[in-house]
Every structure is written in C-alpha cells, then in structure tokens.
Amino acid sequence: MSKIAFVGAGSMAEAMISGITSRSNQSPNQITVMNRSNDERLSILNTTYGVKTTHDYDVLLKDASIVFLAMKPKDVFSALSTIKSFLHEGMLIVSVVAGVSMDSIETIINKKVAIIRSMPNTSATIGKSATAIAQNRFVTNEQLQVVTTLLETIGQVTLVQENQLDAVTGLSGSGPAYIYYLVEAMEQSAEKIGLDKEAAKALILQTIIGAAEMLQNSTKTPQTLRKEVTSPGGTTEAGIHVLQSHQVQEAFINCIVEATAQSKRLGEKLSQEIQTKSLMI
C-alpha cells in the first residue's frame, strides 16, 4: 500500500481524498495532508476522512511514495522550493495544479523525479470527473497504473500527451460550466413557457442524464441521434432551426477554442514566472 502525501487541502484535494478513502483499498492512516496555515481545514479533513494532518514537511514526506500537489498555481514555486530537499528519485509527484507544466516542476526541484500531471474537473466531488493525465519520461508502468487506479476513484481517466492538456482544459476541464450555462437557459425558457419550476428542473436534469447515457451506450453518432428525434415539420426541427439561425454550434466551438487558448496563455505566463524565479536563486 502506497503512503500518500497531499500538499494543499482545498476542494480538489478533498475530492480526491474522499474518493481514495471510500472507493479504494487505500487506508486513511497512510494519507497525510498539509496546508500552509489553515488548522480548521486540516481538522475537518481529519475528522471526516480519518487522514493524518501536519504542518511538518518531514512528517508529511517521510516514506511517502506519492506526493499530490494540490495548491493554487501562484503557490507552486514557493511550495516546491520548500519541499524539494525532501523529494527523491523514488517518489512520484502527481500535480493537479492547472497550468503548471512538468518541465516547470522539474526546473524548480532540479531532480529526476517521476511526474504525472492531471486535469480533473469539478465533477470529481461526486466521483464523476473526466480526468486526463500525462506522464514524464521517468514514470514507470507500475506508477502509472497505481495513479490511474487512485484517480479512477473520482471518475474516468484518460491518458494523453502533455501538449494536449490545454485542449483538455478547454473541453472537459471547463466543460461542466458549459452544461450549467445550458441548463440556466433551459430553466429560463421553462419559466417563460409557463412550466412549474420544480417540475421543469426534474425534466431538464433527466433529459440531460438520459441524453448522456444514450451517447454513452449507443454506437450511433450524436448527429444521427439528433436526426432521429428531429421529424420534418415537427417541434424539434423548429427549435433546432432557431439554434442554427443564432449559430449556436459555432458559438460552442469558439467557446472551447478560446478556453483552450486562454489555458495556453496562462500556462505560458506561469512557466515564464517560474523560470524567472528559478534564475534568481
């Protein structure tokens, strides 16, 4: 059984801790968590999940085989600079920090350590994340399998190349917000056409869940499934024509492309900042 350390104790760290402790054979007493100063937060994690907590880096990292980086991007340089003396080549670092490349992590710690970079989404909190991971050249097949198994406790895991993670961020990382935005519009339209709020909510949610399961279980393409619901001269066709007149499909494409571009811009900025700070040491 791996000894796991979490550097950072925010919502994503908690989602992973919840998944790992409830959906794997990992013992909570083999998980240690720390943050910079929030004792109340650590107390909640200890009480809720039975994990150990500390403010001592030696206690956190002694004998740890997997180190999860779960701090905010702006704190990565200072956190890694502080813990790098405790890191060694037998460890595996798993980063869930958005925008921070594996090269940047290697630059800060200046050691040949196995690194896996992960991009989950907020559905991790209910064990339904669409998570993409990328690995550096030092990761073994065994390490990859262990981390994949751990991350599968918060959802589905897909292995990609690191240069695809900006696209993953734009598509599935931000993806839940796009669906929530769609639901907002459906709720507003339900009110406009006179549907009861609670009834509308139930209908909307089940419609989305049902459509998602159809996509997951059917061999048919989304286009085929859509056309099967769209009878000539019918209600669905009338609605689709309005969406097409407003170029909704094109807007969604542009939305994801721009989110991807922004992820790349933010990542490049972070990399430059880390490089500059590293040169100053």
Question: Residue ranges of each PLM-predicted region?
Answer:
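Short pre-catalytic strand/loop immediately N-terminal to key active-site residues, enriched for Gly-Thr
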Residues: 4, 165-170, 222-227
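Rossmann-like NAD(P)(H) cofactor-binding subdomain of soluble oxidoreductases
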Residues: 48-49, 57-62, 66-133
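Short acidic capping loops at alpha-helix termini that bridge into adjacent secondary structure
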Residues: 27-31, 89-91, 113, 198
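NAD(P)+-binding Rossmann beta1-loop-alpha1 motif at the extreme N-terminus of oxidoreductases
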Residues: 1-55, 129, 191-192
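Hydrophobic packing residues within well-ordered alpha-helices of enzyme cores
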Residues: 16, 20, 42-45, 79-83, ...
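NAD(P)-dependent Rossmann-like dehydrogenase/reductase catalytic/cofactor-binding core
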Residues: 205, 209-281
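Internal alpha-helical scaffold of NAD(P)-dependent oxidoreductase catalytic cores
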Residues: 104, 108-114, 130-167, 180-217
